[in-house]
Design a protein with these regions (language model features):
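Structural motif
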Residues: 23-24, 43, 96, 137
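Carbohydrate-associated surface elements
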Residues: 103, 122
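A short beta-strand/loop micro-motif in the catalytic core of glycosyltransferases
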Residues: 26, 93-101, 165
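Active-site donor-binding segments of glycosyltransferases and PAPS-dependent sulfotransferases
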Residues: 1-34
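Active-site proximal beta-strand in glycosyltransferases
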Residues: 24-27, 38-69, 117
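Membrane-proximal helix-turn-helix segments that form the acceptor-binding/catalytic region
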Residues: 64-97, 105
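Conserved donor-binding/catalytic core segment of Leloir-type glycosyltransferases
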Residues: 123-125, 129-167
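Helix N-cap/beta->alpha junction signal
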Residues: 29-30, 48-50, 101-102, 169
Length: 175
């Protein structure tokens, strides 16, 4: 629940992990996991879900969106440049990025000036079947996080006078 307040120390923590005898390090990252330091001679492949959104394209949603307190917003403002610099420096230690979408590959290129192969997350499509009869509503299944913009989906459905059902949990669930 309070992990966001520890964001400034995450880089310090991930860089303290020691992996002394591995030839290949695989990380799955949306924040700092890509910052793991591989051993000398070891390779690092990062499956990336997003560059550190808290300091890049979603900064306003996290720090200035009215959802954080004044102290948290000021803290984020103070640490933003330092975290961006660390994010770029740690990306340089990755040998190969694999993004979960073309959108994320574009962000890897934009923020890190690095190419990324694309490998979409696996989905077992055979487990899903279309319903015989459709119902008159939109369905949103998501985590209640600032960057997911659940509020925008609610607003859009209200304007269109359409029903919206939302399934999920997260820090913004009470909103």
């Amino acid at each position: 629940r309070y992990y966001r307040y520890y964001l400034p120390v995450f880089p310090f923590a991930i860089e303290r992990f020691r992996l002394p005898s591995y030839d290949l390090v695989l990380s799955s990252s949306h924040c700092v996991a890509k910052g793991i330091r591989p051993p000398a001679g070891g390779k690092h492949l990062c499956y990336i879900h997003s560059p550190m959104r808290y300091v890049w394209d979603q900064f306003d949603n996290y720090a200035r969106g009215g959802r954080s307190g004044v102290v948290a917003r000021l803290g984020m403002e103070l640490f933003r440049k330092r975290l961006q610099a660390w994010d770029v420096a740690s990306a340089a230690r990755v040998d190969q990025f694999v993004a979960n979408s073309h959108n994320i590959a574009g962000k890897v290129q934009r923020y890190y000036n690095r190419p990324a192969a694309v490998l979409h997350p696996p989905v077992d499509w055979e487990s899903f079947q279309a319903a015989e009869q459709s119902e008159d509503f939109y369905l949103m299944v998501t985590a209640f996080a600032p960057y997911k913009r659940v509020d925008l989906a609610i607003q859009a459905c209200n304007v269109m006078k359409r029903r919206l059902k939302i399934i999920g949990k997260g820090q913004e669930e009470a909103r």
